[in-house]
C-alpha cells in the first residue's frame, strides 16, 4: 500500500504541534517555584523520564487514538516505550501487519525546557517497516517542531521528505499565524571565529572529550605568533536543537562522540544519543548538511531506543573535507 509522504509530513507536524501546545499549557499552569515538571518520573533503559515527559506521552497517546489513519498501521518507537513491549497503532495491530515504523522523541531537550531555560524539540521520523532491520537510512519523512520557552512568541517547524528537500515555517504562538522562513547552513570552510564543538554535557568522559576537541583544533589551526585560534562553543543539551543551530547557520560543526569515549573507558552509560535523538537527520541532509559517523561513513543505526549513536554534522561539504579524519 502506497501512502502519500505529504500526508505523513502533515500528520507528524500536527502531532508535533499538539505536543508543543500541551507542554506550553503545562508550563503556564505551574508557578515559577513549582519544580514538579523537573521531578524524575521513572528511569527507562534508555533515559531518565521527568514529569514534563509524562505530559507529552499522554498527549501523543490521545492524538494517535483520535487522528492517526486506521489504514496506516505503524509500530511506534519512542523514548519511554520499553523494547520488549512494542506499541502498535491502531492499538492491538499485530506487529507483522504494520506498514511503517514511526520513531519519536517527544521532548528532545527535556533538561532545558523543564527549567524554562531553552527550547526543546519534538522529533519524528517514519520508515517503511523492516522489523529489526529498519534503520535510520530507511527514514522517508522527518519533522522537527520547536517547543519554546514561556518568553518566546515564535516556534519554528521543519519537515523533509527524502529527495524532495525541506519545508520550513514559523508559528506565532500568540496568534497561531504561520509564515515560511528560510534556513541556510553556513558556507564557511573552516571553524575559525565560528561556533564548532564536541558535545560534553555531563561529567562522565568530559575531560577526555575536551582534550580531544582541543587537540583537534590545535592540529587544524595551530597558534601563530602567540595568538590562539578562536573557535566558539554552545553546549545546547538537545540533539534536535544542535541540528537546528547547524541548519540556521549559527553553528558550523557539532559532534557527539560520547559512545566512542564511553567504550574506550569501559563504561556502559545511557547518557548518550540514541536513534530517536537523531531521527530528524534526514532534514539536515536534504538541506545540504553533511551528517555522518565521526570516524567517517554514514550515520546508520537501528530504529530502536537503546542503541548508542555517535554523530557529526558539518554545515557543508568543503568544511567536512577540511575537518573529518
Give the positions of each predicted feature.
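DPxDG-like acidic metal-binding loop motif
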Residues: 95-163
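Short, conserved micro-motifs enriched in small and acidic residues
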Residues: 9, 47-55, 114-117, 237-240, ...
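A short glycine/serine-rich beta->alpha loop
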Residues: 44-49, 108-112, 229-233, 269-270
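Alpha-helix termini
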Residues: 29-31, 65-73, 128-134, 149-150, ...
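Conserved long hydrophobic alpha-helices within structured protein cores
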Residues: 54-59, 70-76, 122, 241-257
